[in-house]
């Protein structure tokens, strides 16, 4: 009987611990490609949805790419991101909202991506109002349409 009580107590403790620990954050891989879904010079995927605390591992599958925050396309207080060309980088997202990223060497060719963190879209209209060249805007418009 004493062993049974000890097992019940241990099981109860294990359940209590499991339900109070935070869920592990996810890490999503995003490839930076010379050619892929959507054409030449693309992020794959170009639209990523995350929970606060999740991360993206940006992979320069084809060399010559980096990731940089597009000015005006991040929530207030979010860290500015600028990675080294050709280097992998992991970026953690704690602030909810919409983020726009570019590959600086290929921005004029429309190499952009959107990241949506959490449920808040407070900066969506501000992000949509940022001016881009025609090719970049052509790539962003369908991405924005998916997060309305």
From Swiss-Prot:
Q: Mind telling me which GO cellular component terms the entry cites?
A: periplasmic space
| Signal peptide region | 1-25
Report the cofactors: Cu cation
Gene Ontology molecular function: any one: copper ion binding
Q: Where is the Plastocyanin-like domain?
A: 30-118
| Amino-acid positions noted as binding Cu cation in the UniProt annotation, renumbered to this chain | 65, 103, 106, 111
The UniProt keywords, alphabetically, are:
Copper, Electron transport, Metal-binding, Periplasm, Signal, Transport
Where does it live in the cell?
Periplasm
Q: Is Translocase there in the keyword field? A: no
Superkingdom of the source? Bacteria
Extract the InterPro entries matched here: Amicyanin/Pseudoazurin, BlueCu_1, BlueCu_1_BS, Copper_blue_Plastocyanin, Cupredoxin, Pseudoazurin
Any binding details for the cofactor? Binds 1 copper ion per subunit.
Which Pfam families does the annotation name? Answer: Copper-bind
Task: Name the principal localization, coarsely classed.
Answer: periplasm
User: Which Gene3D superfamilies does this entry report, sorted A to Z?
Assistant: Cupredoxins - blue copper proteins (2.60.40.420)
Protein's recorded name: Pseudoazurin
List the source organism. Answer: Methylorubrum extorquens (strain ATCC 14718 / DSM 1338 / JCM 2805 / NCIMB 9133 / AM1) (Methylobacterium extorquens)
